[in-house]
Curated annotation (Swiss-Prot):
The cytochrome bc1 complex contains 11 subunits: 3 respiratory subunits (MT-CYB, CYC1 and UQCRFS1), 2 core proteins (UQCRC1 and UQCRC2) and 6 low-molecular weight proteins (UQCRH/QCR6, UQCRB/QCR7, UQCRQ/QCR8, UQCR10/QCR9, UQCR11/QCR10 and a cleavage product of UQCRFS1). This cytochrome bc1 complex then forms a dimer. Keywords: Electron transport, Heme, Iron, Membrane, Metal-binding, Mitochondrion, Mitochondrion inner membrane, Respiratory chain, Transmembrane, Transmembrane helix, Transport, Ubiquinone. The lineage of its organism: Eukaryota, Metazoa, Chordata, Craniata, Vertebrata. This is Cytochrome b. It is found in: Mitochondrion inner membrane. Pfam families: Cytochrom_B_C (PF00032), Cytochrome_B (PF00033). GO terms for cellular component: mitochondrial inner membrane; respiratory chain complex III. Heme b b566 binds at residues 97, 196. It comes from Chodsigoa caovansunga (Van Sung's shrew).
Amino acid sequence: MTNIRKTHPLMKIINHSFIDLPAPSNISSWWNFGSLLGICLIIQILTGLFLAMHYTSDTMTAFSSVTHICRDVNYGWLIRYLHANGASMFFICLFLHVGRGLYYGSYLFLETWNIGVLLLFAVMATAFMGYVLPWGQMSFWGATVITNLLSAIPYIGSDLVQWIWGGFSVDKATLTRFFAFHFILPFIVAALAGVHLLFLHETGSNNPSGLSSDADKIPFHPYYTIKDILGVLFLFLILTSLVLFSPDLLGDPDNYTPANPLNTPPHIKPEWYFLFAYAILRSIPNKLGGVLALVMSILVLALIPLLHTSKQRSMMFRPFSQCLFWILVADLITLTWIGGQPVEHPFIIIGQLASILYFLLILVLMPITSVLENNLLKW
């Protein structure tokens, strides 16, 4: 009798995806982040579900319902901080996952990469709406500022903003719909992640060398299941350390003040994982230009496969491209720092230079360097 794992219609799918999947024998720990993102998503959905049982999406009671969760619900503080810091871990894994894709040329799997860009947008939208729900000062003003950006769209801008708000300002209608969308989007993200995996398994995984690994494959289980478990242990170690020792490290103190439309915080800023895009937005004096730059800062990822001019897939054997890649990483860290600073000298000019460098590196310098490396190798 054959194994049920290989014959049962449902088990067969799981078997081909996580057990008997042929995987390259040389993939490094940079390939752990896909599974870590899956774990993060499960943590977020489960903690979010329990939070939703106690949360009320009304402007009068939202803030106090979050306080009630932290004070009165059994382990409510743990669930709330796991959810808040779980989002930070999610984005750390996301950025590392995208960085890995850029470095090793994984973007040449076009369908997988484009679904990934779509996933990034969906997760960012989910996180933004989640930040509004506690209805603190930064929640309210963050929602007001970011949704207001849509008014820069010609002709339909102001109507669109009012339509999203459900009125003439961010109010009860806005909070209710944001809660509804924040609840449904993670399930859409989970479905998209399934499609992401489907497309990945059509081609098989890339590997650090960027060369075909068809001649040297090993089964996913037990080799990479054990390797992934190590990554999961590190994830849990960092997440639990954050939650139990410094749960508010990555949050904003202003969000412990209930939302007040009559009092603007001195410095409105989003969560840390949006700061790089926020810095790019602020570096352009024109409103519409800023919004376009903000969208392009993420959408530029979709153009990367078109800008691949190298005859090698991976950056493993391309030292000049490696230099530019790490300059890009440093530039993104600089942008993240600038996004959290007030709009004054010297931060304005640093932000503008870092924004120009960001687009220059991706759109111009990296493709030119790849051509140069091709010529150096006399190909």
